[in-house]
């Protein structure tokens, strides 16, 4: 019989942590101060307004070197996180099934999972710096960018506080998408031409991530009715709301960026 303990043991056997993954467990700190994400998000939004006002009458900075380094570091970080977390989530999925990955908390006490969970949360604060490059280089700042950055920080902190197992999928999928996305940003900043389909692929993966996340939320709600799923109705509500808004916004961005221009070009040619 497959149990949460058996699955946890299997994960611990297959995934021995590296030395750096055995660093001090920062979870108690982030769990206690999770609400700090609200003032951080608010300061972020205020700084956006201040920054845009400051740059209004100024010429945009080049920042090519810093942007390459910034994107490269986040790409490497995301690739490492994706490799480790996809390996663990894949093992739990194949060993115990989907319900084990979204309902039972045993596997999240694995040292590797603990490490990549708290550094993932920390990275959501660091990634707010993406917006600084947009503002200082005087590039268009669209709604989906700052909405996504600010709400993901708060949502991740909230889920972290509640130790929600389903959050493992959010972390894992986000690492995977960001591994590709920041690699693309690195190439673009370095004036290396990536494949033309890569931006469309990244947006497609973001849409898929939100769709899968919404499905996971629905399944978590269903399994919770059997009193067999570690979550709260509050977390379920907000996760579903955010996944759906992200899905709609990314789908709209996809249509505006990749579909409408082709339709207009085709119409003009006729």
Swiss-Prot record:
Glycosylation sites: 6, 110
GO biological process: alpha-linolenic acid metabolic process; fatty acid elongation, monounsaturated fatty acid; fatty acid elongation, polyunsaturated fatty acid; fatty acid elongation, saturated fatty acid; linoleic acid metabolic process; long-chain fatty-acyl-CoA biosynthetic process; positive regulation of cold-induced thermogenesis; sphingolipid biosynthetic process
Posttranslational modification: N-Glycosylated.
Chain segments annotated as transmembrane: 29-49, 63-83, 115-135, 140-160, 164-184, 198-218, 235-255
Localization per record: Endoplasmic reticulum membrane
CC per GO annotation: endoplasmic reticulum; endoplasmic reticulum membrane
PROSITE patterns reported in the protein's UniProt record: ELO
Catalytic activity from the UniProt record: a very-long-chain acyl-CoA + malonyl-CoA + H(+) = a very-long-chain 3-oxoacyl-CoA + CO2 + CoA; eicosanoyl-CoA + malonyl-CoA + H(+) = 3-oxodocosanoyl-CoA + CO2 + CoA; hexadecanoyl-CoA + malonyl-CoA + H(+) = 3-oxooctadecanoyl-CoA + CO2 + CoA; octadecanoyl-CoA + malonyl-CoA + H(+) = 3-oxoeicosanoyl-CoA + CO2 + CoA
Its EC number(s): 2.3.1.199
Associated pathway: Lipid metabolism; polyunsaturated fatty acid biosynthesis
Pfam family name, one: ELO
Domain comment, as recorded: The C-terminal di-lysine motif may confer endoplasmic reticulum localization.
Family: Belongs to the ELO family. ELOVL3 subfamily.
Assembly with partners or alone: Interacts with TECR.
Protein name: Very long chain fatty acid elongase 3
Taxonomic source organism: Homo sapiens
């Amino acid at each position: 019989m497959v149990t949460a303990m058996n699955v946890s043991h299997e994960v611990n056997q297959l995934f021995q942590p590296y030395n750096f993954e055995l660093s001090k467990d920062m979870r108690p700190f982030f769990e206690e101060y999770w609400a700090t994400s609200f003032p951080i998000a608010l300061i972020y939004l205020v700084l956006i307004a201040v920054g845009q006002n400051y740059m209004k009458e100024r010429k945009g900075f080049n920042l090519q070197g810093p942007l390459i380094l910034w994107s490269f570091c986040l790409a490497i970080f995301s690739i490492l996180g994706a490799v480790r977390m996809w390996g663990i989530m894949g093992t739990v999925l194949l060993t115990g099934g989907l319900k084990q990955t979204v309902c039972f908390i045993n596997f999240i006490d694995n040292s590797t999972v603990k490490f990549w969970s708290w550094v993932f949360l920390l990275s959501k604060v660091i990634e707010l710096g993406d917006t600084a490059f947009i503002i200082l280089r005087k590039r268009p700042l669209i709604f989906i960018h700052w909405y996504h950055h600010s709400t993901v920080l708060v949502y991740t902190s909230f889920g972290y506080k509640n130790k929600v197992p389903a959050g493992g999928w959010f972390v894992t999928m986000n690492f995977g998408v960001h591994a590709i996305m920041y690699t693309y940003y690195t190439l673009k900043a370095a004036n290396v031409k990536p494949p033309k389909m890569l931006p469309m692929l990244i947006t497609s993966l973001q849409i898929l991530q939100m769709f899968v996340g919404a499905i996971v939320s629905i399944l978590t709600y269903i399994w919770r009715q059997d009193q067999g799923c570690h979550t709260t109705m509050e977390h379920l509500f907000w996760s579903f709301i955010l996944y759906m808004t992200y899905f709609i916004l990314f789908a709209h961005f996809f249509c505006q960026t990749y579909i409408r221009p082709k339709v207009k070009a085709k119409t003009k040619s006729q």
